[in-house]
Amino acid sequence: MPEVQTDHPETAELSKPQLRMVDLNLLTVFDAVMQEQNITRAAHVLGMSQPAVSNAVARLKVMFNDELFVRYGRGIQPTARAFQLFGSVRQALQLVQNELPGSGFEPASSERVFHLCVCSPLDSILTSQIYNHIEQIAPNIHVMFKSSLNQNTEHQLRYQETEFVISYEDFHRPEFTSVPLFKDEMVLVASKNHPTIKGPLLKHDVYNEQHAAVSLDRFASFSQPWYDTVDKQASIAYQGMAMMSVLSVVSQTHLVAIAPRWLAEEFAESLELQVLPLPLKQNSRTCYLSWHEAAGRDKGHQWMEEQLVSICKR
């Protein structure tokens, strides 16, 4: 019987890509180009010449057998493969960086930029608190804020285009961490000039009133939990883009709205609003701080996490 030839384990092992044959410096170039999505800016960040970065990108394309970056307007756009690689590469670089001597994060001198999403209506109270606190203890750090979730938020967290989200929504996927910060009491708001509402309502009366709400078409709308059936949605007479417009409309009409107590009380006097108990089972919402697990090993990220928890805990 003829003898079957098989590869020796040593031969199979040698056929695999060898890490020692890879120039790991290329990964720092990949990380910078992914973050900047512009060769010139990446070169500036790295302290390299533009031709040197372009050459490194060409070698990266060979290493990963993919284009990685394609021209887009005045910059470049990562391919699907580049996005797939980014989280793992960045996490690996952060692990190495954190172990280097003298690699501790120094907030007083750092010029790092953090991108936060503080969702409405929380932005109206937390943004100024966060901004002022960070400016006082780390004046060279820049914090960039936006105030709404969208369909791309998970993608932005995964690739650290947004580093933290503060919202009433938590992220259920195992790759995300969501830490509860506080629980907000919800109230029913009506104009002091409302012709029939002069005190607390009973549960069965709430949806007999006409309501103003944050638009249910908005991704992760603040108002969505209270209008989860067709019958409840039928009570809505006005849908606005933000809670402030909702409260303004309520103050000038016979509509009612559901809002956080702190927000309703802040504007109760100026808008002449009644702030009443909300006689529904869901009369509170938990606020969460969320981030992607890959970012949590970064010392600067850990510092900002501690600051946000300290500022926002009630």
Curated annotation (Swiss-Prot):
Disruption phenotype: Has no effect on leucine biosynthesis nor on bgl operon silencing. GO terms for molecular function: DNA-binding transcription factor activity; sequence-specific DNA binding. Residues 39-58 bind DNA. GO terms for cellular component: protein-DNA complex. Residues 22-79 form the HTH lysR-type domain. Induction: Gene expression is repressed by H-NS, activated by itself. More highly expressed in minimal than rich medium, poorly expressed in exoponential growth, levels increase in stationary phase (at protein level). Pfam families: HTH_1, LysR_substrate. It comes from the Bacteria. One of its GO terms (biological process) is regulation of DNA-templated transcription. CDD domains: PBP2_LeuO. Keywords: Activator, DNA-binding, Repressor, Transcription, Transcription regulation. PROSITE patterns: HTH_LYSR (PS50931). Belongs to the LysR transcriptional regulatory family. PANTHER family: HTH-TYPE TRANSCRIPTIONAL REGULATOR LEUO, HTH-TYPE TRANSCRIPTIONAL REGULATOR LEUO-RELATED. A global transcription factor. Activates transcription of the 9 following operons; yjjQ-bglJ, yjjP, acrEF, ybdO, yjcRQP, casABCDE12, rhsD-ybbC, fepE and gltF, in most cases it probably interferes with silencing by H-NS and activates transcription. Represses transcription of the 3 following operons; uxaCA, sdaCB and btsT. H-NS repression of the bgl operon, leading to the ability to metabolize some beta-glucosides. It also directly activates the bgl operon. Activation is H-NS and BglJ-RcsB independent. This is HTH-type transcriptional regulator LeuO. It comes from Escherichia coli (strain K12). The lineage of its organism: Bacteria, Pseudomonadati, Pseudomonadota, Gammaproteobacteria, Enterobacterales.
